[in-house]
Structure formats: C-alpha cells, structure tokens
Amino acid sequence: MGRLGAPEGSVSGMELLSGIDRKESRRYVIVSPCRDEERFMRQTLESVLAQTVQPAAWVIVDDGSTDRSPRILAEYATKYPFIKVIPRENRGRRAVGPGVIEAFYMGLDTVNLDDFDYLCKLDLDLELPPSYFEKVLEEMEADPCLANFSGKPYLREKDGRLTSERFGDENAVGAIKFYRTAAFRSIGGFVRQVGWDGIDGHMCRMKGLIARSEDRPEIRFIHLRQMGSSQESIWVGRVRWGFGKYYMGSALYYVAAVAFYRMFDKPYVVGGWGILYGYLRAMLTGAPRFEDKVFRRHLRRYELESLVFGKRRAADRYHRRIRLSHER
C-alpha cells in the first residue's frame, strides 16, 4: 500500500463488483442471536413484521434463554412461517462478543446463502421504522461498492426525547449489520471475538469495498437499551470495548482519544475510563491480538487519518478513493 490509506486488496473488490448483477433481487435473510430478551423482543419482532419489504427468511437462535423468550419466539414462529427458531443449550451466562457470533453462525449454518442477495445480523433489542429495510436496500442498489450499511442508533429518554448513541460513519452498526452476501463472503465473515463489529468494516476497505452508516430520519432506529449494557453493566461493557480495541490492533494513542470522546456519553467520565482500562489491562496482561499484520497496518493508517482529519472526513476520503479505484 503505497500512499496513506489507499485501499488494500482492491483487485478482490474489483472481482467482486464485476460479479454483482445490477438487477439482483431484494431477497434478504435475517439471523438473530438472542438471550433473555423478553423485555424487548416483541418490539423488534413487530417492527420487522411491519416492514414495507419483509425478509424472505428469519432465523432466530435462542442462546439458552432462562426468561419467557422461548415462549414468545414460539408464538411468532407458529404465526409466521418465514420465522425459524433454533434453541441452543444454556451455557449459564450471557456471552457477548464471541458468544454472540457463535450463536449467529449456528443460525447461519442452517441457511443456504446462495438463495439470498443480502444478509442481516439483527439484535432483538431494536425498534425499526417501517421502511427501514426498503431504504437500506435502495442504498445498496444505488451503490455497488457498498458492502454493508445501516442507519444510526438512538436512545429514547424517559421524557420521550431521542438522543444519538454517536456511532461513527465508517461501518454498519453491530446491532443491525446489513451485508451484500457476496461481500460478506469476500471478507471471510465475522471474527469470533470481541471487536468483530469493527474488524469487519476495515476488512471491507482492505478488499476495496465500502462499509458505512448514515444518519437520516427514515433509517434512524431505537436501541431499547444503551449500547454495551447487555452483560452485567455499562462499566463491564466499556471495559470489554477497550479489550476489543486492543484485540483488533488499535494504537494506544487512538484508544486514548476514543476514551476521551466517550467520557461525554452516559455514564459520564466513567465510561471513557472503562474503555482505556480495558485496553491497558489487555496490553499489560499480554492478551492475544488479531494476528493479521496487514490488517493491523491498514487499521493504524486509518486511525491516524481519523485523528488528523476527523472520523467522518477520514471515512469519506477512504470511500472516495475506493470508488475512484473501481472507475479506472
């Protein structure tokens, strides 16, 4: 990679794009790993059923729930033939990160991806606007360089106000990853470790493809609980976030900047410190890291450009270079 931030592996991206039919169908499959989501899953189930473009299939993996989730899922699977529920043995705890992706792949293994043009990994703690998937599909159809895409997550405060979770533009949100199936295969799918939902976007750029999210009213969605709070507490989630940054190969100076930025999110200050603590603890204990050294070089260049130009502008610069590489 000769210049700063130029897309790596663009030949693979070119080959991938050359095989994409501009008239590809709108058949998409949803795979949803879940555990103990009785408080939220009805909102997600109902908002998907209300979509203007519904999924061709929806596989839900019940990852050992101990609440009423299995009963609720059985109710919906009986009513709607395109919903399939797969029970998984209770491991005794919620295991985000690798546990979520293991459950995701358990569901994906029951699907023939050749039957679908798109794949969505969807959490069951979201509330979607009715035209969400229609708008996402329009975006994918308009841009053949686009590997994944999502809207932005918002929290609903007690007074009814919506506040942004301040997610960056450089990737689809982990709770609702919508992928072109060919692109998902091209990057080798999701890594089974904390940080999977950051690694995949950088893998897309290394392949000469675009991963992004956008904040528009028609694709804003409600996160029914704060990001990172599903396992034990926000503090645990932020420490896990820091570990994920270490695992994927982020530089300490970049994580320090991220931690400072997140000090302005609830819980104020503490959340940012949790990210930094998680990273430093992983570093000092010699925790394993993602072993792809080419990926790590790409990541560090991207992070440096993000600090110099800002994350939004850095993502735009990368995406512009990717599109230019395909026009040549």
Regions found by a protein language model. Give the residues of each.
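Short beta-strand-to-loop acidic/aromatic patch adjacent to the donor-nucleotide binding site
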Residues: D115-E127
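Short, well-formed alpha-helical segments that are part of the catalytic scaffolds
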Residues: E37-A50
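Acidic donor-binding segment of Leloir-type glycosyltransferases
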Residues: S47-G92
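Conserved donor NDP-sugar-binding/catalytic core segment of glycosyltransferases
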Residues: G92, E127-T163
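Catalytic donor/gating beta->alpha subdomain of glycosyltransferases that bind UDP-sugars
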Residues: F190-V258
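Non-catalytic, C-terminal membrane-associated alpha-helical segments of glycosyltransferases
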Residues: W235-R328
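Active-site nucleotide-sugar/metal-binding loop of Leloir-type enzymes
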Residues: I101-Y118
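Conserved nucleotide-sugar donor-binding
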Residues: V173-G188
